[in-house]
Curated annotation (Swiss-Prot):
Domain of life, source organism: Eukaryota
Annotated protein name in UniProt: Mu-conotoxin SxIIIC
Species name: Conus striolatus
Disulfide bonds: C3-C15, C4-C21, C10-C22
Tissue specificity field: Expressed by the venom duct.
Length: 22
């Protein structure tokens, strides 16, 4: 599941935990 795939963007909590999608 990519956060930069149009799902919350890099502002999502999952992104902060896996900040490597952006």
């Amino acid at each position: 599941r990519g956060c930069c795939n149009g799902r919350g963007g890099c502002s999502s909590r999952w992104c902060r935990d896996h900040a490597r999608c952006c």
